[in-house]
């Protein structure tokens, strides 16, 4: 007899993890889940500046900047990693070379995220796609050392910066 935890774990593995891991998609499933979860929690996250970028917008960014498989991408406010997922998907589609694909995942995607819970989601998102969160950092972009950013050698930047519509009484949000 299966325990509830065992049943739930098997369900997640069969119906979610396997679909995300092997699906060739730029969809930010964890971001969508987070957004849906926030809608049931009594808030939408917007008061904290949390507005997730839709997939069609992240894909449009990749098209507009004419992303190449050799580019290195930085999202300084990566949230759930939607832009990095779209960039990775786009760049992987542009090469059949296994070594280049490995390099894209390991070296060419960089993200910074200040919020710990969003950093956890972005890290999980990238691990599920075989990236291993190699270049994600829980850091404040505005306080990040510019010379360290230059060392990353990024050729493209993509971002949807957080903004707040909350109370001006909470100056930490501005």
Language-model segments: which ranges?
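Conserved S-adenosyl-L-methionine
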Residues: 47-156, 164-168
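Long, N-terminal intrinsically disordered regulatory "head" regions
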Residues: 169-174
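Long recognition/docking surfaces used for binding and targeting
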Residues: 1-41
């Amino acid at each position: 007899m299966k325990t509830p935890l065992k049943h739930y774990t098997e369900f997640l593995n069969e119906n979610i993890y396997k679909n995300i891991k092997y699906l060739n998609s730029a969809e930010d499933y964890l971001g969508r889940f987070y957004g849906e979860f926030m809608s049931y929690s009594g808030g939408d996250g917007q008061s904290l500046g949390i507005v997730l970028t839709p997939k069609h917008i992240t894909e449009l960014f990749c098209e507009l900047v004419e992303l190449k498989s050799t580019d290195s991408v930085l999202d300084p406010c990566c949230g759930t990693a939607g832009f990095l997922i779209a960039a990775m998907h786009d760049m992987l589609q542009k090469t059949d070379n296994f070594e280049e694909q490995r390099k894209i995942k390991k070296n060419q995607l960089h993200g910074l995220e200040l919020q710990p819970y969003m950093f956890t989601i972005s890290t999980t998102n990238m691990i599920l796609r075989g990236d291993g969160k190699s270049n994600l950092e829980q850091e404040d972009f505005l306080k990040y050392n510019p010379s360290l950013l230059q060392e990353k050698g990024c050729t493209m930047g993509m971002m949807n910066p957080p903004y707040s519509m909350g109370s001006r009484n909470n100056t930490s949000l501005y």
